[in-house]
Regions:
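Nucleic acid-binding interface residues in structured DNA/RNA-binding domains
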Residues: 2-145
Length: 145
């Protein structure tokens, strides 16, 4: 039997028991610190990205701060937050290709330091094009205003 690859939209809808909060284990405390870590659901990250208004941007770390605050945890997982923003971006690209007009504005999410994300649909070029269309200035794959 052939395996049917999931669409990005299906990946976005698959919460896998998330969100959840766990205590950071001693062996990970050197890197993440003491306390608790929230792992968001993919749809939770998508909903946060949808709230970013036209002309505004947010970094993945800013999204993480909102997630941690929402769940009352010390931090939000940087790995899953980044992966879920990537899934959200590709699900939005699928929606756009299907003719939907209102999609998640994935291009408004930046890496730390204002860097564009090469893993988003269309790579850095498409990321820059969409940000420029909203009035932002990009130089060396980085947002400058």
């Amino acid at each position: 039997m052939a395996y049917k690859r999931k669409t990005w939209r299906e990946k976005l809808a698959d919460d896998k028991g998330l969100p959840r909060v766990f205590t950071i284990q001693p062996r990970h405390q050197k890197r993440w610190g003491r306390g608790t870590c929230a792992i968001p659901s993919p749809r939770e990250v998508d909903a946060l990205i949808r709230k970013i208004r036209k002309g505004r941007v947010a970094t993945v770390n800013q999204l993480r701060a909102v997630i941690a605050n929402k769940h009352g945890s010390t931090i939000a997982c940087p790995i899953t937050t980044g992966i879920f923003s990537w899934i959200s971006a590709h699900a939005a690209a699928e929606d756009e290709a299907a003719g939907k007009k209102r999609i998640t504005p994935w291009w408004r999410v930046l890496k730390e330091g204002g860097k564009l994300n090469p893993k988003f649909p269309g790579g850095v070029g498409e990321h820059a094009r969409r940000l420029r269309a909203e009035g932002h200035t990009i130089r060396n794959s980085k947002l400058v205003s």
